[in-house]
């Protein structure tokens, strides 16, 4: 039989539950905001990297150096030298070799400090290009680590599915 009174134990449990739910929601919102910020920054950096032939190559490199890649950048792709300076040097040579280089982003995802981009890169407008996945670890608004995999887009496929 209910007397209409709430015990101190029940009241404290209710208060604790409300506080905990509020903290979890705040943490989730902060995590979501960080993930959105990391994704937005990675997309910005990839746009500067691959899709801005209107900018002088030296200006693109400076933007990438100052705004996108951490001084302590770590590269995991086995065909690319480690470090920010080596990576920026590679980009500078690519701009000379492939002045019509372009990239379209097909899919994105982010979780915590990681961002994934599924991309289609083309050296020239008429080339089939390549499919790639970039994984970036972000810290303080900059790319601090990169993992990448890629494969050429074939003329013919053994299935009816697209790579993108």
Spans of features found by a protein language model:
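Bacterial N-terminal signal peptides
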Residues: 11-20
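Bacterial N-terminal signal peptides that target proteins for export
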Residues: 1-12
């Amino acid at each position: 039989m209910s007397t209409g009174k709430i015990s101190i134990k029940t009241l404290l449990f209710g208060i604790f539950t409300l506080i905990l739910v509020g903290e979890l929601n705040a943490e989730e919102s902060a995590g979501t905001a960080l993930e959105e910020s990391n994704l937005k920054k990675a997309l910005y950096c990839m746009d500067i990297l691959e899709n801005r032939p209107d900018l002088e190559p030296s200006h693109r490199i400076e933007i990438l150096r100052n705004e996108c890649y951490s001084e302590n950048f770590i590269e995991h792709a086995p065909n690319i030298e480690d470090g920010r300076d080596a990576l920026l040097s590679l980009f500078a040579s690519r701009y000379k070799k492939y002045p019509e280089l372009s990239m379209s982003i097909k899919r994105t995802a982010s979780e915590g400090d990681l961002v994934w981009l599924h991309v289609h890169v083309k050296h020239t407008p008429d080339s089939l290009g390549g499919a790639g996945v970039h994984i970036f670890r972000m810290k303080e608004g900059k790319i601090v680590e990169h993992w990448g995999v890629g494969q050429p887009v074939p003329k013919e496929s053994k299935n009816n599915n697209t790579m993108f």
